[in-house]
């Protein structure tokens, strides 16, 4: 009887550890995605983006479209900022910001690869002019 209880207890402990690990990973991924959206949201608000544009982005039913729309809005802002002030480092910072977040959250990699290429292409075009 003691062996059966010990075996069952070990299985329960193992199951609980796996459940805790799974929950922690899920929370980390969600927190990273939420942090990315919130940091971009406050950045956009602080740079003068219109509230109705933000509502249109975040009220979208597709979260992947919302993330992409937010980043495209940032890209448009950086393009305007670059042409107005000639600050190339802002565009480079945006590229590094997107690369850092795509390496953390796996499902964002496929979403941001075309966007990253667009940013790099746009940056190269602006540098040449």
Curated annotation (Swiss-Prot):
Keywords: Membrane, Signal, Transmembrane, Transmembrane helix. It is found in: Membrane. Its main location: membrane. The chain crosses the membrane at residues 38-58, 95-115. It is a multi-pass membrane protein. GO terms for cellular component: membrane. Residues 1-24 form the signal peptide. It comes from the Eukaryota. The keyword Protease does not apply. Partially overlaps HRT1. This is Putative uncharacterized protein YOL134C.
